[in-house]
């Protein structure tokens, strides 16, 4: 079907794109720092961060420079060969974490798919072909492939696609007794987000994660931390596992890892990695020089005291604004999360209306997120300026007033 080449508008989306998204009515065309401009030149303060991706804001000079420099050198070579940016980034991640081996992919879904395949394969070759059970949690989110969406504990995303991968059990989050009730020697892995992002910005308790570590050790199962959303500085530590003092066997990272450029990583120990061999898994684009060069530049900035030590003060500034809004409009029952992954749960009177607040925010020039129908979510740049926080939250207060007065 021929499509007339006219001006690009929001209606163009409905004409040409698969209907799996419901994007905003405006189209962003430019970003700088924590500001976005649309086709009409309207300015927005961005507290959505591309869903916790643009950790250094839009068009950070160091990332732009890394992209331009690498773009003039080598873009893609495939994994028939290796490349210097991937090896440099791999070394940085290993030196900064528990891990001894890393593999790069293109998205959080792919990193988690790799992790789940490795966990099952490791159990098969080291223990038993019947050691296949994966324990995961209600309201979790681990990606959109058939395997990862099945491990995620949200039927609204996984139902309707035919048979799912078998031997996946879901139990309530933060409920160690529920895990104990289903844990046995057939379990190959427990998969958990230290902070459930899509599931409502709910943080695990230290006792829960420590208990999972002990149960995995008792049953020779692997503990897998999905830090796709909460990792790379988001909590104030480089990775959330360091805050909790609980070391996983496998960790996945994406989103902020590339600062806006698609890349993900799965990290593990040398012993666990040795279960794989050439051909066990792979990716055409994973670890390409362009992505790894940008991610390396992002890592060098995020993994600094200047960035990490400033996150709690920025969080408190957001929380102070949210509390002030709640005092004025009586809309939030809980303000939670960690670092700059912030959730504000709506009171019963406003249950199910999170997207109303999101849309109202866009109308007044502030971009926010929801985490389910009842929770507002903020995932701004880790280097967002105080002036941007203040102005953006003032705009959000106007958005709340619009919804409350509606």
Swiss-Prot record:
Subunit structure as annotated in this protein's UniProt entry: Homodimer.
Pfam families in UniProt: Aminotran_3 (PF00202)
Gene Ontology, cellular component aspect: cytoplasm
Cellular compartment(s): Cytoplasm
EC assignment: 2.6.1.11, 2.6.1.17
Protein's recorded name: Acetylornithine/succinyldiaminopimelate aminotransferase
Enzymatic reactions: N(2)-acetyl-L-ornithine + 2-oxoglutarate = N-acetyl-L-glutamate 5-semialdehyde + L-glutamate; N-succinyl-(2S,6S)-2,6-diaminopimelate + 2-oxoglutarate = (S)-2-succinylamino-6-oxoheptanedioate + L-glutamate
Organism: Shigella flexneri
HAMAP family the UniProt entry points to: ArgD_aminotrans_3 (MF_01107)
Note: The reaction catalyzed by ACOAT is highly reversible. This enzyme may also transaminate ornithine.
Biochemical pathway: Amino-acid biosynthesis; L-arginine biosynthesis; N(2)-acetyl-L-ornithine from L-glutamate: step 4/4; Amino-acid biosynthesis; L-lysine biosynthesis via DAP pathway; LL-2,6-diaminopimelate from (S)-tetrahydrodipicolinate (succinylase route): step 2/3
Cofactor: pyridoxal 5'-phosphate
GO terms for MF: identical protein binding; N2-acetyl-L-ornithine:2-oxoglutarate 5-aminotransferase activity; pyridoxal phosphate binding; succinyldiaminopimelate transaminase activity
Family statement: Belongs to the class-III pyridoxal-phosphate-dependent aminotransferase family. ArgD subfamily.
The keyword Acetylation is annotated on this UniProt entry: no
